[in-house]
Amino acid sequence: MVTNDKGAVSIKHAVMEGLARELWEHDEITPDAENQLIMSISPGPHATWRCCVYKEREILRWRIRLSENLDASPYATEPNPNVVQVIDPACEECPLSTYSVTDNCRLCLGKACQNSCRFGAITMTESRAHIDPNKCKECGMCANACPYGAIAHLERPCRKPCPVNAISYDENGICQIDDKKCIRCGQCIHSCPFGAIASKIDVLDVIRDIKAGKEVFAMCAPAIEGQFGKDITMGSIREALKEVGFTDMVEVGLGGDMTAAYEAEEWSEARKEGKKMTTSC
């Protein structure tokens, strides 16, 4: 499956694996260990996934903080309550959402785009139509009217999938997340091609609890069985997790079955009384 976040996920996994190994073997993660991890992922002298090694290493520093369940920014003066956070140095400051005329424009006689615009934002040049971004209200009427489909809606990948319009941008074009609107769905995380949005991770806290001798139960969705090949079963996954240090594994589908049973009883009573009720997923 082709996705926007394949490169970012591989870097995330490299950071998480390095930190987990360090904590498991040495009981703590020192600044020196963090620097060694950064240099192992971005050794230089040439950059491999961003413009320069210095940018790569700064991005890794922010990612390490998120992997340690800390706020991404080491320079923040106030705590960030959101688990979904922006890695500022990774943000490419993509062009803001706008409608743009492409080479498909034939400068036709009908000028449906211009006639459909209620704000006078479209004029004609010698080669194509032109949209004035200062007048455009992004209503999309011109794009719908063009018979050639020559007008494209260029929208930032992080903002496009957000169902609650929680993403905006500062004066420099850096992505900002409105914590009051954000529902932590993670759509922006997977949509950003530069991996500039990520979430806090509590894997290291789990490792600390296991090493401290606490009872820690792994809760796995039934779908986990399909991620490791046909010869891997829920039973083998359970044994592997217990070998790692978990007390036991519980399939969350069991909780779903229990919920369905309780809801069936609740619905039966509601039906007798002529009431309506919703169900969980």
Where are the model-predicted features located?
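Iron-sulfur-associated redox domains of electron-transfer enzymes in respiratory
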Residues: 1-63, 67-69, 199-281
